[in-house]
């Protein structure tokens, strides 16, 4: 399940985050292209905001079930789970935020591998910065420190037993916190695995530019040449342009 039904309010753009493009691909397509490399994934569900129906259609996605999102993340997730739980032969589900397109295939494979032995698998990374809690917002100098030893950030994709996470969403909507794992941890044991710093969430345009820079660093540019014999009675094309000449290439360039 790829969640892409938010309003992207903090991103501040006429085009929502899911449809922003890097190297010619939207964030939706980047996420899907990575996930489709794994044969274990039998169905793909994209949860979208109904106001973006035209944008979704323009992507011309293949083999992807489109589900309209709800008024919040929990309702959007439940809408997708409600569809998936009625599909035959599916017992596990991965739930992923479209705003985290930079997960590696190594992390994805690790999540799938751990799901063989656990009912919930979630990537996490340690908090390394100093943490402070403000006691009085009007007097920010009064703060208390928080020990970092037991603090960490969770990431997506997050994997679950399908029936269990569906039941929890359906029966605990009023208790919903921030992500799916916070709901699951109240009742079940969770396997945490090492996440990736590069799997950051795109919240604002600065995050997006950071991601764009990462993709630029992966690109390679080179210069090459080709040789063709020139013969009479043929047109000369270079880079697709017809060049006036008495000779033309015995080939295409």
Regions found by a protein language model. Name each.
Residues 1, 5, 139, 185, ...:
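SAM-dependent methyltransferases
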Residues 59-92:
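Short phosphate-binding loop-to-helix
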Residues 74, 79-84, 210, 217-253:
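RNase H-like, Mg2+-dependent phosphodiesterase core
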Residues 1-53:
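N-terminal glycine-rich phosphate-binding loop and ensuing alpha1 helix
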Residues 2, 28, 80, 97, ...:
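Residue-level signal for inorganic ion chemistry
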Residues 102-193:
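Conserved core of the sugar-phosphate nucleotidyltransferase
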Residues 21, 102, 159, 178, ...:
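Short aromatic/basic micro-patch
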Residues 48, 55-57, 135-140, 228-242:
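Acidic-glycine-rich active-site phosphate/pyrophosphate-binding loop
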